[in-house]
A protein has these predicted regions:
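Gly/Ser/Thr/Pro-rich low-complexity, intrinsically disordered segments
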Residues: 1-280
Length: 280
């Protein structure tokens, strides 16, 4: 396993492999360029990621707020404009007339090995129990798990989605339970702890109708998103070159946007020889 280290190929999917896989899925791919993070050894992307509106990975607020390189991302909106602005996220489960906030999607915070205090977090079919043979995603069981099924796959900035509670698993107070995982794109699991778990346990039963949403703002804009990917750094933003002042000669790629936000620019830098200037 990669163990989240930059230690070579191992289980990571290269960009070429991603293009090959997507073409086999029927995507019309002309070329690919790295914009940020890669799939980790845990089997899900690192950083904020939205794919055809689906919230594939939304990292928890502590990471989003404390790490400046986790704030910006490349966004391609449904109206065919683009942006590199910072992003924010809010998500809610509506039970009757009460909204219960959740804070992340498919984040390792569900392992319950931190003290951040975010008491409700969602995971979907993207979060797999065994993403690769012999590699497992642990989920903390000392929580209430609400399993739901939407009438259609939930996408960001598309309002409320109707859902039905299909299972409730209560692992609180040390109860021995099997943590639920889902395999359908319409399904999700909400892991809840603390007072919010007590409130939901009292309010819900299997078969109940609920509603759920996922809202992403890019800068001051909140509209339908086709793709969003963590860009790590904004080297080319609003038509302005903002590359790091690094004399190290190394290859680099990035994706940028013009000032109007209507043109995408792909940048490839060859820094492998002494005659190259790298990112300078």
């Amino acid at each position: 396993a990669n163990n989240n280290s930059n230690n070579g190929k191992k289980l990571r999917e290269t960009l070429s492999e991603t293009c090959t896989r997507r073409r086999a899925e029927g995507r019309n791919i002309v070329a690919g360029i790295n914009t940020g993070f890669f799939n980790s050894h845990d089997g899900f992307p690192r950083g904020f990621h939205i794919e055809y509106g689906e919230p594939v990975f939304i990292n928890n607020p502590t990471v989003r707020q404390s790490l400046s390189n986790h704030r910006p991302g490349f966004t391609f909106f449904e109206d065919r404009t683009v942006s590199f602005d910072n992003r924010s996220f809010t998500g809610y489960l509506k039970v009757n007339d009460t909204d219960y906030e959740y804070y992340s999607v498919n984040d390792t915070i569900v392992r319950l090995n931190n003290t951040d205090g975010y008491d409700a977090n969602l995971y979907t079919s993207r979060f797999r129990k065994e993403p690769h043979p012999g590699i497992y995603n642990p989920v903390g069981s000392d929580a209430l798990f609400v399993v739901g099924r939407c009438s259609q796959q939930m996408t960001v900035n598309d309002g409320w989605f109707d859902a039905t509670v299909t299972a409730i698993v209560d692992g609180r107070n040390g109860a021995s339970v099997e943590v639920p995982f889902v395999s359908e794109k319409t399904d999700w699991v909400l892991q809840v702890t603390g007072e919010k778990a007590a409130a939901l346990a009292a309010a819900l039963k299997v078969g109940d109708a609920v509603r759920i949403n996922a809202n992403v703002s890019i800068g001051s804009v909140s509209k339908q998103i086709i793709m969003h990917n963590s860009s790590m750094y904004r080297f080319l933003n609003g038509g302005n070159w903002n590359a790091v002042n690094d004399a190290t000669l190394m290859p680099a790629t990035c994706i940028g946007a013009d000032q109007a936000g209507t043109t995408v620019k792909l940048v490839c830098v060859d820094g492998r020889t002494s005659i190259d200037t790298g990112m300078n």
